[in-house]
Amino acid sequence: MTKNVHHFLAFDVGEKRIGVAQADSEVRMPFTVGTISVDSLEMSRVRELLAEVRPSIVVIGLPRNQRGETTAQTAVSQAFGDKVAALGVEVMVQFVGEALQ
């Protein structure tokens, strides 16, 4: 019996850099891929990573403040997710809350 293994690519969007991690449903242990500079070439690098990893799901962290409210960075992360979805690559984009506590 063949097992379906899902590959995940995760992005943590910051002001100057985007942290990138990779995981799969079999090993279930994420590991750091590296960082991408936030600049005019960021989406080219994201496209390269999508082609290399071929994830079934892209996970993007959505930061929240201590009260669980959205912040300016939340909007930046959501916009990044929209750009990933617009690349035309068949991948599900999911947002995951990152609440400061």
Residue ranges and their predicted role:
Residues T2-F11, E15-Q101:
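Phosphate- and other anionic-substrate recognition elements at nucleic-acid/protein interfaces
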